[in-house]
Swiss-Prot record:
Family: Belongs to the DnaJ family.
Subunit description: Homodimer.
Protein name listed in UniProt: Chaperone protein DnaJ
CDD domains documented for this protein: DnaJ (cd06257), DnaJ_C (cd10747)
Chain positions recorded as Zn(2+) 2 binding sites: 167, 170, 189, 192
UniProt entry tagged with the keyword Cytoplasm: yes
Zinc finger boundaries on the chain: CR-type: 137-215
Cofactors named for this entry: Zn(2+)
CXXCXGXG motif repeats: 150-157, 167-174, 189-196, 203-210
Organism in which the protein naturally occurs: Cupriavidus taiwanensis (strain DSM 17343 / BCRC 17206 / CCUG 44338 / CIP 107171 / LMG 19424 / R1)
GO cellular component: cytoplasm
Amino acid sequence: MAKRDYYEVLGVGKNASDDEIKKAYRKLAMKFHPDRNPDSKDAEEKFKEAKEAYEMLSDPEKKAAYDQYGHAGVDPNMAGGFGGAQGYGGFAEAFGDIFGDIFGQGGGGRRGGGPQAYRGADLRYSMEISLEQAAHGHEAQIRVPHWDDCDHCHGNGAEPGSSVETCPTCHGAGQVRVSQGFFTMQQTCPKCHGSGKFIPKPCTKCHGQGKLKSQKTLEVKIPAGIDEGMRIRSSGNGEPGINGGPPGDLYVEVHIKPHAVFERDGDDLHCQMPISFATAALGGDLEVPTLSGKATFPVPEATQSGKTFRLRGKGIKGVRSGYPGDLYVHVNVETPVKLTEAQKEMLRQFDRSVHEGGSRHSPQETSWLDKVKSFFS
């Protein structure tokens, strides 16, 4: 049976980053680990397949060979075909096992007298906050998965009245030696799946896992200035490790709700501000909202629609910034609506007055007319 593509096994694209590859492997390893699926041959095969894929794609040299030549590029039996050192990885590990037998130490990979320990998988929690909370900081409580020792078996995985025994196949080592011709290899024990333990009667409540999933409340402190998509790490609050391995971490990913007034651009803020025709023409003081209260700035006379004003220091002080950003106010001149006949007549008189005597009171209109005249001349 032909091997599956390593990227397909992990469920990632060929342009996946090292972090994405690692996350995909951890997710599959926790899902299909033999300790969690003691009676499933299919899960065991998928675990081995994911482990092999990760070992190849997490090694830059092996990954480069695989990307160029496929499975043949990392097959130790075809090492001479491509002239790359990465092709000899399998043989180097085999010789490492031989030297380990002679000198009491391994030449590559994991060696040791106990079962393999695995770090727990990381967890991700998505949280949505307001722009004000992002700017000023926020404290929140979240509910996340938690694993407690099983109260039925007290965490050892065995049904009360029975006991956990040392694996009779690997004698507690978690690994067994397998001879292949002149070479001696180590592989995960097929009976205990690397735990070094054997449970004749698994706990009926936790099914031999020793832990039960529950929920717990965590306090999360969101720093002032946090931006969209940033993550906060809570060490040790991920899934528990396997065989004594350390727990994973919890990552709280922050998303910011759209704001009714402001749009954020890094540490800067932008807002659209409507102003009257009279204010734009005559000038005046304009009061605008900010995240820290109201601010006033002067609007000069003859201000055109679309003009942008910059208020320094009225933006957000980012988590990595030493000073706050700016607030950009984009003014839009509003055309008056629902006018009375008297008001309309006043505007007609005003319009006639500004066009009398050749005075140029509308710079954009005049510029446009000049362009049209030159076009037809």
